[in-house]
Amino acid sequence: MSNKGQLLQDPFLNALRKEHVPVSIYLVNGIKLQGNIESFDQYVVLLRNTVTQMVYKHAISTVVPARPVNFHPDAEAAS
């Protein structure tokens, strides 16, 4: 089930996952998590470092890639 809110976040997270880009995820309480995005769905992101953590999206404030990422939301939505 896709909605307008996911037309941007899904292609972005998918590009980070496919390209194995290390990310820093900041939670709303200020905690910083680091690792690679293993998978994601409508509600959670699986973040892999030494262990795999399930992080609920409602707890995420910011996702910061370690390097620039090229992603095209329009191309992903069309496929």
Curated annotation (Swiss-Prot):
Domain Sm, chain residue ranges per copy:
10-69
What GO MF annotations does this protein's record show?
RNA binding
User: Would you indicate the residue range of the signal peptide?
Assistant: none
Q: Which GO terms describe its biological process?
A: regulation of DNA-templated transcription; regulation of RNA stability; regulation of translation, ncRNA-mediated
SUPFAM superfamilies given in the database record: Sm-like ribonucleoproteins
Alphabetically ordered keywords of this record: RNA-binding, Stress response
InterPro entries, per database record: Hfq, LSM_dom_sf, Sm
The protein's matches in CDD domains, at most eight in alphabetical order, are given as: Hfq
GO CC annotation: cytosol
Family, per entry: Belongs to the Hfq family.
Function statement: RNA chaperone that binds small regulatory RNA (sRNAs) and mRNAs to facilitate mRNA translational regulation in response to envelope stress, environmental stress and changes in metabolite concentrations. Also binds with high specificity to tRNAs.
Could you describe the subunit structure of this protein?
Homohexamer.
Full protein name: RNA-binding protein Hfq
The species this protein was found in:
Burkholderia mallei (strain ATCC 23344)
